[in-house]
Amino acid sequence: QITYTKGIPRPVYSPIAAAQIPVVAGQVPLSYQPIAASRTVDPQYDPNPQYTFSYNVDDPETGDSKSQEETRNGDNVQGRYSVIESDGSRRVVEYSADAVSGFNAVVHREAGAAPPPPAVVRSAYQPVAYKSAPVAYSDVPAARYIQPVYNPVPLQYKSAPVAYSEVPAVRYKRPIAIPAGVRTSFTAPFGNYAY
């Protein structure tokens, strides 16, 4: 049981909190027989893997030129790859990997021809030739009126006379309120209130 107070919690020991766990003694065997571990070997596992692969790409349209070849015999891997850089030089990397030396690579750079010019992309679309028709302008004479369209009638304004009259005020007697003799009080655990 831990009691939390201000600061660091400290354990508080209580005889009630201690659990009594009964121990059951069983029969102990006199000798142990080891369980025979059965080892299963994956039928597709090859303890001495071997392979060889290579590829070569030479695309004159995009200028992509690279190649790679690699051979593996067990844990020993040897290979090389080359790529044509953007400046026309050729980078060749020869590498090997084994359990003793790890991975090692040697990089050579060979001067090459100038980089190929970028591929010319021709558009199949041609601009459409069009000719706009000439615009004809002509003056339209302004309309003239010989007589006015409407005849204005003069307006006369008259204000109505204003009459004021007083309305007598309504008066009434209000009864005087007398407080009732009722008193209400409340009692709560922390104080008393009375109204």
UniProtKB/Swiss-Prot annotation:
<dbReference type="Pfam" id="PF00379">
    <property type="entry name" value="Chitin_bind_4"/>
</dbReference>
<keyword id="KW-0193">Cuticle</keyword>
<feature type="modified residue" description="Pyrrolidone carboxylic acid">
    <location>
        <position position="1"/>
    </location>
</feature>
<dbReference type="GO" id="GO:0042302">
    <property type="term" value="F:structural constituent of cuticle"/>
</dbReference>
<dbReference type="GO" id="GO:0005615">
    <property type="term" value="C:extracellular space"/>
</dbReference>
<dbReference type="InterPro" id="IPR051217">
    <property type="entry name" value="Insect_Cuticle_Struc_Prot"/>
</dbReference>
<dbReference type="GO" id="GO:0031012">
    <property type="term" value="C:extracellular matrix"/>
</dbReference>
<dbReference type="InterPro" id="IPR031311">
    <property type="entry name" value="CHIT_BIND_RR_consensus"/>
</dbReference>
<dbReference type="InterPro" id="IPR000618">
    <property type="entry name" value="Insect_cuticle"/>
</dbReference>
<feature type="domain" description="Chitin-binding type R&amp;R">
    <location>
        <begin position="48"/>
        <end position="118"/>
    </location>
</feature>
<feature type="region of interest" description="Disordered">
    <location>
        <begin position="38"/>
        <end position="78"/>
    </location>
</feature>
<protein>
    <recommendedName>
        <fullName>Cuticle protein 8</fullName>
    </recommendedName>
</protein>
<feature type="compositionally biased region" description="Basic and acidic residues">
    <location>
        <begin position="63"/>
        <end position="73"/>
    </location>
</feature>
<keyword id="KW-0873">Pyrrolidone carboxylic acid</keyword>
